[in-house]
């Protein structure tokens, strides 16, 4: 499909898929079984609005790709890429490429009025990826990360990215 028609084609196909009660939709040009409109919108908005944050954008697209790979889905790496997208955005916004996520969140909390509860929630989510099944570190055993885990992380991280980008655009 030519690029000029791609967006219209995807919208048309998604309308047909929804009308026929299909369990699939296109999200960022990838066929996936994410069908909830809010989840799709959150992921697509994060991908589209993170274009100016290339590291974030690359990680989000990789997370979606790992999640939707029909031949060999890689849920562990989808989770890793989802949280890495958040980390990349926060580090970029902090202005310190060597900053940790915690230091970056402190900077964002001060400069963009990030609520302490949001900061704590994200820190906890990041901790989950550091501790559980070695998601971000060397695997010791076979991963127990499921599709639901990976989808949750992609949608949640996309929502957080949308929130932070929205907060910085308000200032």
Language-model-detected regions and their locations in the chain:
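Internal, Lys/Arg-enriched amphipathic helical interaction segments that engage polyanionic partners
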Residues: 1-55
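A general marker of short, structured functional hotspots
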Residues: 5-8, 20-22, 71, 122-124, ...
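Non-catalytic, well-ordered alpha-helical scaffold segments
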Residues: 7, 61, 76, 80-83, ...
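Long, positively charged binding patches that form subdomain-scale interaction surfaces
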Residues: 31-119
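Long, charged low-complexity segments
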Residues: 101-171
